[in-house]
Amino acid sequence: MLSLYYAINYKNRKMVERLLREGVHPDSTIKGFYRPLVKSILLRDVDLVSILLQNGANPNNINDETVSPLAIAIKVNSPTIVSLLLDYNADTSLFPLYVSFPIIKVLVYHGIDVNVIDRESRSFLHYAAKNDDVDTVISLILHGANVNVQDSKGLSPLHHAVSKKTTLTAKILLENGARVNIRDSLGRLPLHLGANTYEMVKLLIDYGSPIDIKDVNGSTPLHYAIWKSSLDTIRLLVNVSTINALDNNCNSPLHYIILSETEILVELLLRGADITIKDICGNTPLDILCKLRIKKLDNIKAIISNAFLMREVVPDLLKLCGFESNRKIISNISDLKQHEVSCIKEIHLMKEHSFRKNGPTILDVCTDKVHFLHRLVNARDNVQYKDFPIYCKYIKFRIEKAIYKKTIIEKTILLLDDILIKHEYTSWHDLPYELKHYIIEYINIEFIKSLLEHTNLKNKE
């Protein structure tokens, strides 16, 4: 029988045929050697495989090998051998579901169900999405693969594509009906798994993914994004529902970020992160920072800056955020003590500077006390940012917000003008501009934004 092994190993087809005619069994085995059919498949020799099958080799023999001949043919990526085995009734329940595009074409041709699942309830599409095999993903979808099938862990093909940061595959799945709001067994949306990549986050949000859904641990995509995401990604995930959302341990995004980059910490503070929230152990973000043996001074400064500024709105904020209870620690670090003094001086200066004569002060602007700030955007050039090194970001942020609001309001006025004129309602059109402006100021900005987007979409159609 060894002669058959040597003939196969040296790809001597004539010798193989002669030995089989002389009565050597095509499935003969010798301990420590592959079966003849398996060895031929590993050599990717189509002729040898064909000869053995024609002479009675069993295409489903797995007595010694841990996988079937069909599985091995798929693994070595030989469509021709796969087709041969299927022609000889290879068992289609004995092969892996991660297959290449050429193999998929063969399997589909032989009538294999593209929605078949393995013991982990994963389908062909799960594996193709996980491995960013775009051609296979497209082929499977064209042949009826279920884009929303979930495996034993509740993961959909979109979850797999997103977790591997394969944006193109994710986009193809979304274009073909993949649901962005599908949850796995841990309550995670695809957005939770893709929260560290700007392109993926933007793609999922563009396709309607909610950003405020919590997983079983109470974490939003923003909680996931904090550690490894860029500032631009964080901005996509922040809104009034997520900025102070608490996980099951009462950690806000600010608790997560305190040991990370100061730039992202400041961004959360600008957008309304609450520095008074306590975690399950009763610690505010400042408490945690002050308890660390190695102090992250820039982050402590950022929270102190916010505390002294917002104290103008909430008088007992220093106590609530943990500043008073940590005063001794802060006072013993000269850099922090000096920062406290600088904050107080700068806030006093902000009280003295107005946007225009007898108008709101810069402090009013920074503490959101001015509802009609967008009316003052033309006076923004009066601000000398160099005079406010600590709070210049707060001032710029509020002014940019006001400019955005003014733009939205003006677009909405034009939109409403257009709607009313089309319907021959001249009453709105005849209203003074200031009165129209005043009315729209009280409309929810997010509602206006969605209204404008909807109108733009209809116009494109």
Curated annotation (Swiss-Prot):
**Can you tell which superkingdom this protein's organism belongs to?**
Viruses
Report the Pfam families cross-referenced here. Answer: Ank (PF00023), Ank_2 (PF12796), Ank_4 (PF13637), PRANC (PF09372)
Query: In which ranges do the ANK repeats occur?
Result: 1-28, 31-61, 65-94, 96-116, 120-149, 153-182, 186-213, 217-248, 250-277, 281-312, 358-385, 431-460
PROSITE patterns listed in its UniProt record = ANK_REP_REGION, ANK_REPEAT
SUPFAM superfamilies this protein is in? Ankyrin repeat
Q: Does this entry carry the keyword Flavoprotein?
A: no
The alphabetized UniProt keywords are: ANK repeat, Repeat
Which InterPro entries does the record cross-reference, listed alphabetically?
Answer: Ankyrin_rpt (IPR002110), Ankyrin_rpt-contain_sf (IPR036770), PRANC_domain (IPR018272)
**Name the record gives this protein:** Putative ankyrin repeat protein FPV218
